[in-house]
Amino acid sequence: MAKKIVGFIKLQIPAGKANPSPPVGPALGQRGLNIMEFCKAFNAQTQGMEPGLPVPVVITAYADKSFTFVMKTPPATVLIKKAAKVDKGSSKPHTDKVGKITRAQAEEIAKTKMPDLTAADLDAAVRTIAGSARSMGITVEGV
């Protein structure tokens, strides 16, 4: 028989930097999960990633105090800001442009995000990434 699920916990944790302090500790502690076990497993799985890159994770908590977790790809906005070499998007996105990325950079981001996007093919994924970039005040060349 399958384990009884008692809840899902969604967090964004920097790669390789999970520790028992907030937000991780309180979120897992409320469900009675082993915080250090999660931190060690998460840090081990994110070892190959760029340190500090925020990684969305969905933790499934079971009635017997065990858990499983699924990591998603980093948010598109973080990848776009990194490619454009800017710290934050524009406060007036359609008026003030804060940076630019090329189509090749948008394709690279789309390939990274492809498992989490609903796009049917790479071209549709590139258009999705380009739309996100435009809404941040970042120009996409060649799209």
From Swiss-Prot:
PROSITE patterns the UniProt entry points to: RIBOSOMAL_L11 (PS00359)
Any one annotated GO CC term: cytosolic large ribosomal subunit
PTM entry text: One or more lysine residues are methylated.
Family matches, as Pfam families: Ribosomal_L11, Ribosomal_L11_N
One GO term of the biological process aspect: translation
CDD domains listed in its UniProt record: Ribosomal_L11
Origin: domain of life: Bacteria
UniProt cross-references to InterPro entries, sorted A to Z: Ribosomal_uL11, Ribosomal_uL11_bac-typ, Ribosomal_uL11_C, Ribosomal_uL11_C_sf, Ribosomal_uL11_CS, Ribosomal_uL11_N, Ribosomal_uL11_N_sf
Keywords: Methylation, Ribonucleoprotein, Ribosomal protein, RNA-binding, rRNA-binding
Gene Ontology MF: a single term: large ribosomal subunit rRNA binding
Record's subunit section: Part of the ribosomal stalk of the 50S ribosomal subunit. Interacts with L10 and the large rRNA to form the base of the stalk. L10 forms an elongated spine to which L12 dimers bind in a sequential fashion forming a multimeric L10(L12)X complex.
NCBIfam families hit by this protein: L11_bact
Annotated function: Forms part of the ribosomal stalk which helps the ribosome interact with GTP-bound translation factors.
Family: Belongs to the universal ribosomal protein uL11 family.
Protein name, entry field: Large ribosomal subunit protein uL11
Taxonomic source organism: Burkholderia mallei (strain ATCC 23344)
Gene behind the chain: rplK
